[in-house]
Amino acid sequence: MAGHSKWANTKHRKERADHKKGKIFSRTIKELISAVKMGGPDPKSNARLRMIIQKAKDQNIPNENIERNLKKASSADQKNYEEVTYELYGFGGVGIIVEAMTDNKNRTASDMRVAVNKRGGALVEPGSVLYNFSRKGACYVPKHSIDEASLLTHMIDCGGEDLDSDDEEFFLVLCEPTDLASVKEALLAKGVTCSEERLIYVPLRLVDCDEETGKSNLALIEWLENINDVDDVYHNMA
């Protein structure tokens, strides 16, 4: 899964988990702004906005933050956000996928080039890395809310395909992208807490690296994750 490697120590994983939580909040706010730009600021008539506001509340984003960004989104000066995907090869044949949501694609592309110049790797043509990954739906279930055995039983009953427990904070219930909404609703009906649901990339095979190569890849991945516009970085390093 994204962000997990045997070359990352416990402190490193904790720092990255905290960083990822901040990225999740940031992406939700960008999704909120995008929803307003596309469908207007009234959640009663904008179903997508209504869904994202609920997601923000589920993530414990303060109401004042939500209201402030609703006003911000209604401003003519606020640009809309676009989703962009970049593909890279790191060291030792490791594939990397970067997902970003940006209001300035030129800025994001420049930041990606800087990352490669500073930390190595190579940006490649679309499709060059994606074939090593599968697109999946994922429901994020807090680990403190349920034990793994119970969730596994619920997952099977609800139409999920697999349960990933690698994340420090969440179980990920995986399913086909087209089944994500129905799997989430079925889990909620069984009393399972779903903090977030989204589409992710899952590696089809993992690439083994020696220690030096692994650490070089982690340095590149960290740099990519710290780009402001970047929301997710996926890799297939073991």
UniProtKB/Swiss-Prot annotation:
TM ranges are none
The UniProt entry, under Pfam families, shows: TACO1_YebC_N, Transcrip_reg
Q: Where is the composition biased (Basic residues)?
A: 9-21
Where does it primarily localize?
Answer: cytoplasm
Query: Where does the record place it?
Result: Cytoplasm
Similarity annotation: Belongs to the TACO1 family.
**Keyword match Transcription:** yes
In terms of SUPFAM superfamilies, this protein maps to: YebC-like
Name its GO BP terms in alphabetical order: regulation of DNA-templated transcription
GO molecular function terms listed in the Swiss-Prot or TrEMBL record: DNA binding
Q: Where is this region: Disordered?
A: 1-21
- NCBIfam families (UniProt xref): PRK00110.1, PRK12378.1, YebC/PmpR family DNA-binding transcriptional regulator
One GO cellular component term, please give it: cytosol
Q: Which UniProt keywords apply?
A: Cytoplasm, DNA-binding, Transcription, Transcription regulation
Q: What is this protein called?
A: Probable transcriptional regulatory protein CT_457
